Design a protein with these regions (language model features):
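Non-globular, low-confidence helical/coil segments that flank catalytic cores
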Residues: 2-24, 31-398
Length: 398
């Protein structure tokens, strides 16, 4: 009976088609046009959604989109629930902007090694694109090196900063001008800085004075009371950013008499959101990375690594990388314009061995990781992984 009814329906459809063949052609064209319009809207208007669909069809997995998208010139149109981590291309230096899903912002370091005016202007233009209300909720200086601190005094002057996190290091500038500026600061605030080591550079003094005179701003030192306590924990709408800072005991026992020891006071941050973890490092290295690994209990599965110290071979140690087990590495560096030979091929090889996708500001320009139900990567310049896998030799073999 069913077969008989099917045959009748088929015959009826055939007769209808013979009577009005144009209707079928018009309907087919309409369907094709609708599909074409839908494709254009999705592909050009919502590139991230398109890439997510294609990733699922390719079987790339349900959690991570391992393909970079072109960073829009006017900035990313974020979707509800997005958390984004921006690495600005400042050449040899560091500048990380975090935009939290509840509307708060955090800036970690902001500088270029040569204090270049063009780089400074570009960095502020980028910040202005996303920080539209003239206010930054959090600013952190990881350590006192010039390529992390140079622009921060201007950041504090330009924006109302509510919270500043900084090293337990007193500014003792050699120039008479900045010496007088520091001496004029509030004695109660100066008494917070308990470490015997000091920094005498003018750029640190500029930041130091700007930070301690910022109105209505909370100053917190990057110091943990002990290894079981995190002094800096930022919590919000479904996100947590926990910093593992040097302990008071570490500051008391250490002498910051070398570049490596100064770098090692950089806090290591773990940003958690929607099941994803991002590792933030400053210029962390082989001194403080093992301390972090011990404090997390030896293993903490993460996703994205902000590479420490611009890809130096004394950072991103084997033990550290094995402990965090990331899929992505992003590096702030300028391979063609620095005397330090960063990033080192030795370091790059460690990422390659772990099958990590590598992004670099010297090749990719600005880099943005967006976290929601997936990870999406935006870059200013798209290059192949083969390009990003070429580092520089160590200075001894250069």
């Amino acid at each position: 009976m069913a077969k008989k009814n099917y045959s009748k329906a088929k015959s009826a459809a055939a007769r209808a088609a013979r009577r009005n063949p144009k209707a079928i052609i018009i309907a087919a064209i309409a369907v094709i046009l609708i599909l074409a319009i839908a494709f254009c809207i999705l592909y050009f208007g919502f590139p991230r959604t398109w890439e997510n669909i294609m990733s699922s069809l390719r079987g790339d997995g349900t959690d991570v989109v391992d393909a970079s998208l072109q960073l829009p010139t006017g900035g990313i149109a974020f979707e509800e629930g997005d958390l984004s981590v921006h690495m600005l291309d400042v050449g040899q230096g560091d500048c990380i902007l975090i935009l939290f899903p509840d509307g708060k912002e955090m800036l970690i370091d902001c500088a270029n090694y040569n204090n270049t005016a063009a780089v400074r202007e570009r960095a502020f233009a980028y910040l202005d694109m996303y920080v539209k209300d003239g206010q930054l909720d959090y600013v952190m200086l990881t350590h006192c090196d010039s390529d992390h601190v140079y622009f921060l005094d201007e950041v504090i002057d330009k924006y109302q900063v509510d919270n500043i996190f900084m090293p337990n290091v007193l500014a003792e500038p050699t120039s008479d001008r900045w010496k007088a500026e520091v001496n004029a600061l509030n004695e109660e605030l100066l008494s917070m800085f308990t470490d015997k080591d000091t920094v005498d550079t003018a750029c640190y003094a500029e930041f130091f004075c700007a930070a301690l005179t910022e109105p209505n701003c909370n100053i917190t030192l990057n110091v943990d009371p002990d290894e079981d306590t995190n002094a800096i924990v930022i919590e919000g709408e479904d996100y947590t950013l926990t910093f593992y800072c040097p302990t008071q005991e570490y500051y008391d026992d250490s002498n910051l008499n070398s570049a490596e020891k100064k770098n090692a006071v950089s806090p290591i941050g773990i940003l958690e959101y929607n099941g994803f973890r991002t590792v933030l490092t400053g210029d962390s290295n082989e001194i403080n990375e093992p301390m972090f690994v011990e404090r997390i209990g030896g293993k903490l599965d993460c996703d994205v690594l902000k590479v420490g110290h611009h890809g130096s071979e004394t950072s991103s140690t084997e033990e550290f990388l094995d402990a965090i087990d990331c899929e992505y590495a992003f590096i702030s560096c300028n391979a063609k314009g620095n005397k330090f030979n960063h990033p080192r091929q030795t370091t790059i090889d460690r990422f390659i061995e772990r099958d990590m996708a590598i992004y670099r500001t010297d090749n990719n320009g600005d880099i943005v990781f967006v976290f929601n139900t997936r990870i999406t990567v935006y870059v200013q310049n798209r290059v192949t992984q083969d390009v990003n896998r070429v580092g520089l030799p160590s200075l001894a073999s250069a």
